[in-house]
Amino acid sequence: MDDMNSMVPAARLEHVRFSYDNGVTWVLDGIDLTIRSGERLCLVGPNGSGKSTLARLIAGLAAPDGGDMTLLGHHVFDGETASANPSEYRDARHGIGTVFQNPEDQIVTTIVEDDVAFGPENLGVARDDIGGRIDESLQSVDMAVSYTHLR
C-alpha cells in the first residue's frame, strides 16, 4: 500500500444515526468513528446495543438514516442531503469483505484455500486458473501462501 492510500481511513462515520422504525427509536445516534487502514476493531456490548447494526453499516450492507459516512475513500452517505450514493457504495464494496456472526453457516470447508476456491468454482472459472486466484486473494489480505496442489 502506498503512503497516500495509508492516509485514507478505511471507514469514517460522523454523527451517524440509524433506526429500524423510521426514527422512533435510534439504534445508533450520533456515532463518530474513524477506522484507519490496517487497524483492527472489536465491538463489545450487550445484546441489542447496536454492534451488528454498526458492523453492517461499516461493511456497506446498510445505509444510515443520517450523518456522513465514507468507506475506503468513497463518500457513500451524505448527511446534508440524507442520501446514499449507490455508485460510491458499489465501488467501496469491492474492497470490503464480511464474515457474519455464525461463520459455520457460511463457510464451505475448514480448509482456507478450498473455501476461497468455492466462489470461482461456482462461477465456472477453469480449474487451472483457480490456484492463481486463491494466491492473489490471500495475498490481498496478507495471508499469502502457495497452494500449488490446487492447480
Q: What is each PLM-predicted segment?
A:
Residues 2-10, 18-30, 42, 80-81, ...:
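A short, flexible loop at the N-terminus of ABC-type nucleotide-binding domains that lies
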Residues 21-22, 80, 117-128, 140-141:
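ABC-type ATPase nucleotide-binding domains, specifically the catalytic core motifs of the NBD
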Residues 44-46:
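The feature captures the beta-strand-to-loop junction immediately N-terminal to the Walker
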Residues 59:
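Helix-to-loop junction immediately C-terminal to a conserved catalytic motif
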Residues 67-80, 92:
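Conserved ABC transporter NBD signature motif
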Residues 104, 110-121, 131, 135:
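Short helical segment in ABC ATPase nucleotide-binding domains corresponding to the A-loop/adjacent helical element
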Residues 148-149:
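Conserved small/polar residues in nucleotide/adenosyl-binding loops
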